[in-house]
Amino acid sequence: ICLVFMIFNADFSPIFAQNILPCGTDENLANEILRNPERQEKLFETERSIETYLASNSISSAEQLHLIPVVVHIIYSNQNDNIENAQVYDAISILNEDARRTNPDTSNLRNIFKSVAADLEVEFRLAKKDPNGKCTNGITRTQSNLSLAANNNVKSLIGWDNKKYLNIWVVRSINLSGFSGPGIVLGYAAFPYNNIPGTSDGIVIRHQNFGSIGTA
């Protein structure tokens, strides 16, 4: 999920670096650890699990596309925030261009990154089935004033099983408790860990920074 949000918009800067704007995702993690110190150990456990998996499993060089079902929850306070489906489709398309490295500006990549730039072989697709097995376009709409100054509170309004879907909440504005940086938070994601609850997992992003059309 962190990777997903970097693709969208985020500035992943070190949280305690001097003269560098803090990252909302890092500050969200710091706040979680402050409220629950066990959160740090869960993060370490996940990293160790990944290291163990990589050490005991051979990595195939064969191309294999991994599909990730996505549900976009539009949380709107009024109709001006209730973005159209076309903007959602556009945002997912841009996300996939960057993940698959098919975006038209790849030739402008800085030399320092050229040796590591690659197709992630990951594709994000709007879900076609909801948690009850019913057909869906992968977009939900919920009217709530929580769209204003949103944070993890919007996740309690609606969320699909985070073990089966990537949840993205699109809101009007974001207010992270404890965020010390100037300006505004465009969006943030949760650092994943084993059995992360749905009330913490996922991405929250302003509709003005979601895609390239409509209100973006």
Q: Which sequence ranges carry the predicted segments?
A:
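Fold-level signature of zinc-dependent metallopeptidase catalytic domains
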Residues: 50-96, 170-175, 187
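N-terminal zymogen propeptides
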Residues: 17-65, 99
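Bacterial Sec-dependent N-terminal signal peptides
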Residues: 1-23
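Metzincin-family zinc-dependent endopeptidase catalytic domain
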Residues: 89, 93-216
